[in-house]
Amino acid sequence: MANSKYISGLDLTDLMVPTKAATVFAAQEASLYMSGGLVPMIDVPAGSTQIKVPKLAAVADPTALTAEANPGVDIDTVIPVDSAVNIDLGLYATRSVVRDIGGISTDEIGRVLGNAIASAFDKKVTTQFASLTTQELSGTAPAGSLAVSDIFTAVGTIRNTGETGELFGIVSAGAYGELMGNIGSSAFAGGEFQNSAMRNGFFGRVAGIPLFVSSYLNDTDMGTSSKLPVAAIMSKDAVKGAMQGGVKLEIARRPEAVGFDIVASVAMGANVIDSTRGVIIQDAS
C-alpha cells in the first residue's frame, strides 16, 4: 500500500511494522527450507555464533534373555558413541533504499527483501548437499538428465544404512523436465505442505518419497564445477540448519540518499550431520 506519510522521516513506525511483516512473510513463503519442514531448523540462543548438533552411533540389536539367563553384558558396551557436528552461523543481509518521492509500497519492499533472504538461505542449505554420499548417473538417460532408476538406487543406498524414516528429494530445475518426460505427469500424486514454496515446488512421488524442484541445485551455486548435481535424496538426519531470531528488519534515515535504508537480515547456518543418510546424484562425466 502506497503511503506518503513515510516521507522525510515521519511515521517510521507506520513504515516499519508493515514492511517487516511483508518481509518475514515473503521469506518464509519463498524458502523451501526456512520453515524446517524438510531440513530441520534449530534455534540458536542469542549471543551464540555456533551450535553443536549431537550425532549418536547406532547400537547392536538386543539379545533375547530368559529370566534365568545371566546377561553378562557391561552397560558400557551398549552405550552409543556420540560425537558433535558444529553449525556455524553466518549473517546474511540485503538492503533497499527508499527515496523521498512518495508512493512507497511496503508490500513490494517486503516482497523483494524477503525473496532475497530466502534465496541466500536456500543456497546455503543446498550447498551442504555436495557432502552427501555420491552416486553417478546410471547412464540410462541422456547426459545430465535424471532417470527414475537413479532415484530407486539412491533410496536403496540410504535404506541399506538402516535409515527407516521418511525421505525426501530435491531435483534440479535442469533435470526436472527430462524426468517428467520419462515417466509422465500422470504417475505423480499431489501433496499438501505448510508453505507455498513446498506446495509449488512439490511435483510428485517416486519410490514413495516426495520430490521438490530447486533452481539452486546446480554446480555454480554448490561450487561443484566438475560435477553436475541433478538430485539429492535424503532423510531429515542428513542435513540440519540453524537460525537465530528469525528474519530481522532495520530502518535508518540516510540523508545523503534523501531517503531510508531498509535492511533485512538473518543469522543462519547449515551443515551435514550424517552423510550416509543422504545421496547426491551427479554427472561427473
Indicate where each model-derived feature is located:
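Protruding loop/beta-arch "assembly-hinge" segments enriched in small, turn-prone residues
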Residues: 1-35, 205, 235-237, 241-285
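Assembly/oligomerization interface modules of large self-assembling protein complexes
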Residues: 17, 21-89
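Alpha-helical scaffold segments that mediate packing/assembly in large oligomeric complexes
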Residues: 91-165, 280-285
